[in-house]
A protein has these predicted regions:
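Active-site lid/adjacent beta-loop-alpha segment flanking the redox-cofactor pocket in flavoenzymes
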Residues: 211-296
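C-terminal catalytic lobe of FAD-dependent flavoproteins
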Residues: 269-330
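Helical element adjacent to the flavin cofactor pocket in flavoenzyme catalytic cores
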Residues: 127-164, 171, 175-182, 317-325
């Protein structure tokens, strides 16, 4: 007889987990919104990480490298590659150009040094690398189709306030990302340590660098990403010290940091022309003691079949499967 499994959160990780488990279990996903992939899954920059962005965190870089190919194969129809990706080493970077080169070569990364034609003297070296983005609409369509084919049930507009509301299920998986610790506390369970949750901003804009994405490393600079054609030329830009520190006005509305980030971008690229479009805001959770962005799977106790899954980069969903298999026979 097939056992029943509950998953809290119909984001990318929750949907992938539901499809993974559906071969052996009856799966029900509980989602408090009226659609899937509306929160953290939609706030990511859509960059398919190869590890280039993490020269100071080999654990994250290696995890990205390991899961890159499985993601590319799994979602081949959603991959976008019609742009150039530039990595620029800032003059006051946490890593020198030599250190960056040593790390990337040891990881087997594909890149080449190019002439600095657009950056100011705040950049010492520029590298062109092979990087990709993805179309979230296509990925969403793929996952919903597979959920339907595997009879994964999704309960929309259903907020789970206490995990023991789901005590009639044989196993419970928490995939609600930034809200996991709140749910654990409400359930009388121990929250995940060293996790910081905060409101983050995703800025959508246009510039005159056609089909060029830029990442300035390593420090509090900025990272841009080209988007699929359906976004009509829009790009996204983030800068952790700005987009992860959001203020609220007297009316309770989030205040965008785009003007400060645009000023920074002009310091590095003097001739850039910038046009703000809009921003999206949402909760984000990270390891507050390091910039490690790997996936973590934790069983809440030996006598409870409750599992917390804290997603990392989007490709790291494949390491979630490995960790689950190591915990039990799923």
């Amino acid at each position: 007889m097939r056992k029943d499994v509950a998953i809290v959160g119909a984001g990318f990780y929750g949907l992938m987990l539901g499809i993974f488990l559906a071969d052996r279990y009856n799966v029900t996903i509980f989602e408090e919104e009226n659609d899937v992939m509306t929160k953290a899954s939609s706030l990511c920059q859509m960059r398919i990480h190869t590890g280039m962005m993490y020269p100071t965190n080999l654990q994250t870089a290696l995890s990205c490298i390991k899961t890159f190919k499985p993601f590319m194969v799994r979602f081949k129809s959603a991959i976008v590659d019609n742009f150039t990706s530039l990595y620029a080493i800032a003059s006051d970077s946490k890593v020198s150009c030599e250190e960056f080169l040593t790390v990337q070569k040891s990881l087997g990364q594909k890149f080449k040094r190019i002439d600095n034609t657009i950056f100011s003297n705040r950049v010492t070296d520029v590298f062109k690398c092979e990087e990709f983005t993805f179309d979230p609409v296509i990925i969403k369509s793929i996952l919903l189709k597979e959920c339907s084919e595997k009879n994964v049930k999704i309960e929309f507009n259903h907020k789970v306030n206490n995990v023991f509301e789901l005590s009639n299920f044989d196993k419970i998986f928490l995939c609600n990302y930034a809200e996991i610790n709140s749910l654990l506390r409400n359930s009388g369970l121990t929250p995940i340590e060293n996790v910081s949750s905060f409101v983050t901003e995703k800025i959508f804009y246009r510039d005159n660098l056609d089909n060029v994405a830029v990442c300035v490393i390593d420090g509090n600079y900025f990272s841009t990403m080209c988007l699929p054609e359906r976004f009509n030329g829009l790009k996204t830009v983030t800068g952790a010290d700005i987009t992860n520190n959001i203020s609220i006005d007297s009316n309770g509305k989030y205040i965008s940091g785009y003007q400060r980030l645009f000023a920074r971008m002009r310091e590095f690229i003097p001739d850039i022309e910038l046009e703000y479009d809009h921003s999206e805001f949402g909760l984000k959770s990270v390891n507050k003691n390091s910039n490690c962005r790997t996936c973590m799977v934790r069983k809440e106790s030996f006598d409870l079949n409750i599992y917390s899954i804290m997603g990392g980069k989007i490709t790291n969903v494949f390491s979630m499967f490995d960790q689950l298999k190591n915990l039990e026979k799923f």
